[in-house]
Amino acid sequence: MLQNTSTVYLSRLASPSLQRFLQSNGFQLNSLDVPAVYPEISTHADILLCQLGLWEKAQIFHGDPEKLARNYPGNIRYNAVCTGKYFIHNLQYTDSDLLAAAEAKAAADSTILTKIHVKQGYTRCSLLPVDDRSFITSDAGIAKSLACHDTDVLLIRPGHIHLPGFDYGFIGGTGGGLPLSGRRLLVVNGNIETHPDYKKIATFLEDRDIDLYYSKDRPLMDIGSILVDAAPKPLQQPVRD
């Protein structure tokens, strides 16, 4: 097994081959159970955790499960996207401690953090960050909000993603970016080749020098994002499994 100090947070429902791939590359896997929210999303990492920054600078903010409620909007307070340059969420419902942590990390990294308000409260579920300014989403409202800033957005067709208990899931919830062997890798849960916009997605990543790994043993499935902590210290006490 390769040496790696990074921890990956993902649902225990993630593809077995994806989990084996991550473990074989030395990532420590951590899954959550959040009984405060409804069962279909209770294993989703992005309901309780928020990744601040990308790649080698990624750090995990651990939310307080006692602040969460079963239904929307009480279950979205941590479901934000923070690339380091941008903090994207429905700011009406963002947890104040999360926002303060994002601002503190940006200051520590000598980065100016731009906050972008979107109507979609399940922001991380709906938005897959590719780099500091590049994103993939099927949500036209998010795409419109990001277009007002220095961003590149690939707007894909909605649907074609499995999510148990719902008609379909969302692209943000299928994956996440990891640093691996000096490269930047986007990992996706399930066979993304089945998505009708797969070729556009692959080209979007290739143009940004991002490698792609996906598991073909399962359908493309929203598992509540794949989040990585590449930093040596957590921002809060870690959540127990």
Language-model features, listed with the residues they occupy:
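Histidine/cysteine-enriched polar flanking segments
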Residues: 1-241
